[in-house]
Amino acid sequence: MNRPDAVPGTAPRPPLPEITFPEALPVSARRDEIAAAVRAHQVVIVCGETGSGKTTQLPKLMLTLGRGKLNARPGQRARLIGHTQPRRIAASSVAKRIADELKTPLGAVVGYKVRFQDRLTREASVKLMTDGILLAETQTDPLLEAYDTLIIDEAHERSLNIDFLLGYLKQIL
């Protein structure tokens, strides 16, 4: 099949999965407002109650805004949507939840990387990880160029890793 957007010598990109937003979640009701803020600003802080959908819906919203590898145009460097969680169990369970909501296998569109476990394919667009994993990546990718979007979840917990990470991000922005 000859696609006009195909880059010679590369495999065709898989299509974006159907993305839906549960109407019962407050973040779903405010997604247009959040999307406008993300388009207009380099840094956006989203606050909401526990259970409002921030953790599971924001990565999906970023996909609809054209972020992540699945949205990369031909000749454009494909980058990830990075999403940190303070704990390994949270990173893996959130990745599974988002993959389930997208009706895709874990690792295909959404995966995770934690200490001793990496459940990401090369085609994945959303990478859940601990904040320690992202901090470690600054050693080999100081400008974090592997990412076009970073979601620092649970930043209010103010762990040493999160504080270092937020300070580091402030310096490179």
Model-derived regions, located:
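Helicase-associated low-complexity/disordered flanking segments
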Residues: 1-43, 59-74
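Conserved P-loop/Walker A NTP-binding site and adjacent catalytic elements of P-loop NTPases
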Residues: 37, 42-173
